[in-house]
């Protein structure tokens, strides 16, 4: 209503239209704080007055979600609960958090691998690789991005350990 917004993910069915703000951080230990939750809620509040056409039908937003690969601060969780903002983080909520979703689906992102450097991870992203299983299906990808055979073997061992847990 007030300004133009981009939505990272939009999901809908017959009854709902959901806006998802996805926050990705690659710095270990970083937490999503209350400012992030406030920002997402403000965007949702601005957008919920607009009408969107998805699936050939005019719709109003019914829910706003914040999804992140980090943990939330206690204040962010308290605010989200108070304002009914759906939040999914590394360890929140207790059931259905990002860790559980990854483990239940078996869709482990390769970014969790400690045996790859940041530069190697960037190269994999640049060629469209996201999941450990993508590398498992085609281990040659690792040598294609510059790993030596022995390095690739170590990465494959880690993938085996990660994907079997």
What kind of feature is each model-predicted range?
Residues 1-109, 120, 125-128:
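Intrinsically disordered, low-complexity Ser/Thr/Pro/Gly-rich regulatory segments
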Residues 99, 103-165:
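C-terminal extensions
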């Amino acid at each position: 209503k007030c300004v133009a917004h981009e939505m990272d993910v939009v999901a809908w069915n017959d009854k709902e239209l959901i806006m998802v703000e996805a926050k990705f951080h690659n710095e270990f230990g970083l937490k999503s704080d209350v400012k992030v939750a406030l920002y997402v809620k403000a965007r949702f509040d601005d957008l919920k007055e607009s009408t969107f056409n998805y699936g050939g039908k005019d719709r109003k937003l019914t829910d706003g979600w914040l999804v992140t690969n980090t943990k939330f601060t206690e204040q962010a969780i308290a605010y989200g609960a108070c304002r009914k903002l759906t939040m999914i983080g590394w360890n929140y909520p207790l059931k259905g958090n990002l860790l559980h979703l990854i483990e239940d689906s078996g869709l482990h992102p390769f970014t969790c691998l400690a045996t790859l450097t940041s530069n190697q991870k960037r190269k994999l992203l640049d060629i469209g690789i996201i999941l450990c299983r993508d590398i498992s299906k085609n281990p040659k990808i690792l040598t294609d991005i510059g790993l030596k055979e022995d390095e690739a073997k170590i990465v494959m061992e880690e993938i085996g350990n990660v994907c079997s847990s």
